[in-house]
Curated annotation (Swiss-Prot):
Binding annotation for substrate: 194-197, 217-220
Name of the featured protein: Isoaspartyl peptidase/L-asparaginase
Subcellular location: Cytoplasm
Catalytic activity line of the entry: L-asparagine + H2O = L-aspartate + NH4(+); Cleavage of a beta-linked Asp residue from the N-terminus of a polypeptide
Entry EC no(s): 3.4.19.5, 3.5.1.1
Oligomer status and interactors: Heterodimer of an alpha and beta chain produced by autocleavage.
Keyword vocabulary terms for this entry: Autocatalytic cleavage, Cytoplasm, Hydrolase, Protease
InterPro entries registered for this protein in UniProt: ASRGL1_meta (IPR033844), Ntn_hydrolases_N (IPR029055), Peptidase_T2 (IPR000246)
Gene Ontology annotations of biological process type: asparagine catabolic process via L-aspartate; proteolysis
Amino acid sequence: MKPVIVVHGGAGKIVEELDATYRAGVKRAVLKGYDVLSQGGSALTAVEEAVIVLEDEQIFNAGHGSVLNEKGDIEMDAIIMDGKNLDSGAVSAIRNIANPIKLARLVMEKTDHMLLTCEGATLFAKAQGIPEVPNESLVTERSRKRWMKNLKENSNPVADQIGLGTVGAVAIDCEGNVACATSTGGLTNKMVGRVGDTACIGSGGYADNNVGAVSTTGHGESIMKVILARLILHHMEQGKSPEEAADAGLNYMKSRVGGIGGVIIVNSSGDWTAKFSTNQMSWAAVKDDQLHIGIYHGENNVTPLEKAL
């Protein structure tokens, strides 16, 4: 099996002046993940490493750069799933952690549970030697300005959420194992304690070697209502291609609950897609030594991998 990896930097509306920054970010992430796969590493490690890159990039709403809740603080969610045995680990409403996806994997591998939240997740992180960082160190000037703007009367936090999507990755390795990983800072100016789709298995992501892997982005409550990631895999189980399944899932979410978003998918044969119902979604993929990058509908810029390194 030839390895494949796809990453996304969130669905929404990307302003033109940040176009190149988003492209550079997803490119770095997908190349990091593919480097793991090309050396015989697992899909699980590949998606984790790719998402760590995205969490460290200030432009994305995950890790460093996460949006602020109504109190001006950061609370983050993340999930990772292994398609080989359906094991999954997730964390929600966590603070003071630079890379939530690392903690999510530890939940999967070091506990009998699948999701730890808030204080419990913090205690677990300490026990595992994950260093705490001041939440303020994760706050960017961009996030702070957006938070302050939405404190004003007649503000519209929902509209201001545009371009602040979740980040994620899906991959299949040389042994045919698939995995997904998703991480987010959530909704800007959200209520304290709000947890969205990302940390919820089947919504923020799902991976099953028998079918494939999905990572989602978009309006979290809408994604949760239709259990988007698992819904898409169900369509694939019924014989749809990744592209057909993505369209079916996104169209259903829009028609049924009025939600928009985006998905990245890889199936058990290594076929992949990146689809979205928002204006834009930054994404990148590597397959057959070809780097693919896009932001706009119908865009797929292809570069030989040797020229992209």
